[in-house]
A protein has these predicted regions:
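Glycine-rich, basic loop-to-helix element that forms the pyrophosphate-binding segment
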Residues: 97-116
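Conserved donor NDP-sugar-binding/catalytic core segment of glycosyltransferases
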Residues: 135-166
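Short beta-strand-to-loop acidic/aromatic patch adjacent to the donor-nucleotide binding site
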Residues: 118-131
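Short, acidic, metal-binding catalytic loop of nucleotide-sugar glycosyltransferases
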Residues: 52-62
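A conserved acidic beta->alpha catalytic loop
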Residues: 67-80, 130
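Non-catalytic, C-terminal membrane-associated alpha-helical segments of glycosyltransferases
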Residues: 257-264, 275-339
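Acidic donor-binding loop at a coil-to-helix junction in glycosyltransferase catalytic cores
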Residues: 213-224
Length: 339
């Protein structure tokens, strides 16, 4: 934990750094109009499964894959990415972003895709520990074309290493935001999303605010800004992605810290929208008032869900918001915090 929002990564003080091109497909066609972006960090085994799921997509559409290695010292993802590109399983590139952090990696992926594929209209994203269902890309792109939505989202369903943890699928830390296809007010995560090209032109650069670089939540902030700008969202329940959840992420401590992080993100997203000192003061009071209210919500969940971990979530979120308002927050995306 460290002191909060004013010390989040400064977007102006960081000098530009050149990204290294680690691998590019032979005779890469820049006219491809669909690009899948993958930020990569120290999960080469899972990345291999992610890329295999992309290679097996059932679609006649041409697409490219942009992979961003965000650990320049180890570069464990580069050999995996290079092997798929060299084998011609799909066209694409792998670049190395030397500046560490979640938002750095995602921005590098989107910026590379936008620059290298000037005709691309649809930019999808999947994480390097996720597996796309066979029709994922086709369903996402078809929905975007049919609805005209600016942004399309789909469910990320947890797959637990320990099947005894299957009951956690309904926990807010793992459950998708929606359970039916159709228009939605906003989506919250970028682990299963499609963004149309004009979206990037309408928002300021960089797309993902670097103040969320180590906290996380740059995607929540990005989509919230899109909503405030009047952009439209659509949910495709059938465009399923599964996420590999290791046993370490099912422990009560990790789930509690996830709740704290969600609370901190909620505070910072709302703080950005609070333009005056008075509004920020009221926001701080609101976040502090959520603590006693969370006890009521926790009690209700104990009665309805009969699960202590489920009941703990609203208290952890409220505590995370209150701590962030006081200048204390987790930093799960610092390299030193990731194993």
């Amino acid at each position: 934990m460290r002191s909060g929002y004013p010390q989040m990564e400064n977007t102006d003080a960081t000098p530009p750094v050149t990204r290294a091109l680690a691998m590019i497909s032979p005779a890469l066609d820049p006219s491809i109009d669909i690009v899948v972006c993958i930020p990569c960090f120290r999960r080469p085994h899972y990345l291999r499964q992610t890329l295999e799921s992309l290679a097996q997509q059932r679609t006649n559409r041409r697409f490219a894959v942009v992979m961003v290695e965000n650990d320049a010292s180890r570069s464990e993802s580069v050999p995996v990415a290079s092997s798929f590109l060299a084998a011609g399983k799909f066209p694409g590139v792998c670049v190395v972003e030397p500046r560490q952090g979640n938002c750095r990696a995602i921005n590098a992926a989107f910026e590379t895709a936008l620059a290298m594929f000037p005709n691309a209209t649809s930019f999808l994203m999947i994480d390097d520990d996720e597996i796309a269902s066979r029709d994922w890309l086709e369903r996402m792109v078809s929905a975007a074309e049919a609805t005209g939505a600016d942004i399309v989202g789909g469910p990320v369903l947890p797959e637990f290493d320990d099947e005894r943890k299957r009951g956690l699928r309904r926990h807010p830390a793992f459950a998708p935001a929606y359970d039916a296809s159709g228009p939605v007010p906003v989506i919250y995560g970028c682990g299963n999303c499609l963004i149309r090209r004009p979206v990037f032109a309408r928002l300021a650069d960089p797309a993902f605010d670097l103040r969320f670089n180590f906290l996380g939540g740059g995607d929540t902030d990005f989509f919230w800004r899109c909503r405030l700008d009047g952009m439209t969202f659509h949910w495709v329940e059938e465009a399923v992605i599964t996420e590999t959840v290791p046993e370490s992420r099912t422990k009560p401590r990790w789930i509690a810290l996830r709740g704290l992080r969600i609370g901190a993100i909620n505070y910072h997203v709302q703080r950005k929208a609070a333009q005056t000192g008075w509004r920020r003061f009221k926001l701080t009071l609101k976040m502090l008032a959520m603590l006693p209210l969370s006890l009521f919500h926790a009690g209700r969940l104990v009665l309805t869900e009969h699960r202590a971990l489920m009941a703990m979530h609203p208290m952890a979120v409220a505590a995370g918001s209150a701590l962030a308002a006081l200048g204390i927050e987790p930093q799960p995306y610092k390299a030193s915090k990731i194993t």
